[in-house]
Amino acid sequence: GSEMCIRDRFFTEYYGNPSSVYNFAQKSKMAIEDAREIIADSIGAAKSNEIYFTGGGSESDNWALKSAAFGLRDKGNHIITTKIEHHAILNTCAYLEKNGFEVTYLDVDSEGFVSLEDVENAITDKTILISVMLANNEIGTIEPVCEIGEIAHKHGILFHTDAVQAMCHVPINVTEMNIDLLSASGHKFNGPKGVGFMYMKNTAKLEPFIHGGAQERARRAGTSNVPGIVGMGQAVKLALGTLDKDTHTIINMRNYIVDRILGEIPDVTFDGPCIDADAYVNAVSVGLPMCSLKRLPSNMHFCFKDVSGDSLLIMLDMNGICASSGSACALSLIHI
């Protein structure tokens, strides 16, 4: 669509290096800054210079956790997260544990929600960072990040959220949601693969993760992926332009499928938060959408008793239905 057309022009016409001073290159630089403005506005960032472009969600997660941990080490060495985070968070935490940090992994309830009381009780005088995903990629649970951010700030603790699964699928406002650091990836909202961003509140001031040149205000070295960044900016613009309409359509389709499967196939369980058909409408009306939503509108997760998952996926695939028995990052481990 239009995202691809605009992106492709920066492969074929405006291919100058945005770090150079000549006019041809400045067209690329202007396009990057336009994308930065679009993304900043889309998540309610106070300033566009709080958006840093990266190679994807995994890099953003690594940057947030490692730079926060090592940068705040003089204040403490304790990090709080959950057991249901993406591998980019869990494996980074494991790395930090090997380097002298202590990590508390919180349990979640049967619907995937982390307890606010558990978050509060896990905090110590050594806690420097709390990282809880905004929305789970397998069962769709939207965590109470607004309240978790409040708890973190009450104790003077930095709060990071992995919003890879949520970006452009539900409304996000980093200011109202008390978020200091946020990770996202373009491929999750019809943007290009291999490009993402991190929101870093100006007061956070994390150290660079990738060292080298002065790109991204000397916070993230490396020649900018201009087509990827421009494409991601356009994808955000397109997705948010039809978010309300698309969400209602998706919710209706999702609920139809859930009702048919649960009503016609025996011994099936629907995992994750219960579906509230009016949740999105009600949430939008109160002005803080995310704090009222419990599940991603597009998410479904079923368990079929006495059925081979691989066989079921093959049959679905043969009928033109794309489904998975786990997250893509976890499935790739099977083939190692």
State where each predicted segment sits:
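Pyridoxal 5′-phosphate
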Residues: G1-E3, R7-L333
